[in-house]
Amino acid sequence: LSSAASDVYKRQYVNNNFIIMCTKDGTIKKTKLEAYSRPRQNGVNAIVIREGDQLIEAKLTSGNAEVMIAAREGKAIRFNESTVRPIGRVGAGVRGISIEESDEVIGMICVEPDSTQDVLVLSENGYGKRTDLDEYRITNRGGKGVKTINVTEKTGKLISIQAVTDDNDLMIINRSGLTIRTAVSQIRLAGRATQGVRIINLRDGDAIASVMAVPAAGDEEEVQSAEATGAGDATPDAGQPAEE
């Protein structure tokens, strides 16, 4: 691209895209990307956070995405991004999902209309599942959502929601420092309200700290089984999750 054409493309990109943010109490805010095009050395205000709340996700969108917000007690809501009116940087946003006072939002995904991504959720005790996006009906923003995993004492609370395809691996980091990598293609599709399967085996006293979907490992990178990882190992994992 010529310099002039490149400048036009950059302006169009900035003018036509948005940042969507979500907080722990279920507030969602949408702002034009253009609002952040003149950063300051010490940063700029992006959202007003109410006392006791905190920002947990920020996603770049086209303005036409479908938004899913998931909560710790196992419910998730899906709605069109178009129902969220863009506002300026200085603002608190609107209600994305209604949750009980004892509950909290654990994550948000934004899926574009032509995407082939599925929804993957993971609980704090290592249970997870992959579900077709269409099993989550589109509803009005601000509702209570529908069950996305059957939370039990065995599964523990919901800890992560990710948008994935077979071309992804799931990276799981435990509080002990152990990093586990499992191929998403090994996780079969399951119904929306099911318990799922055991994705990883946690050692006593350990817990999941962070989860991320990453590009799948190539042939040159081996993805090992969690069960083959001995105590004290600091890396790998994956392979076929064990069904419960």
Model segments located where?
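Generic long, charged, amphipathic alpha-helical segments
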Residues: 140-164
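Acidic/polar low-complexity surface segments
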Residues: 42-46, 92-97, 142-151
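Acidic, low-complexity intrinsically disordered tails
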Residues: 212-244
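Single conserved hydrophobic/aromatic residue that forms the stacking wall/gate
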Residues: 1-5, 9
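Per-blade loop-tip surfaces of WD-repeat and WD-like beta-propellers in eukaryotic adaptors/scaffolds
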Residues: 37-41
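A structural feature that tracks compact, well-ordered secondary-structure segments
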Residues: 18-36, 47, 58-61, 66-84, ...
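Canonical WD40 repeat/beta-propeller blade segments in eukaryotic WD-repeat proteins
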Residues: 105-106
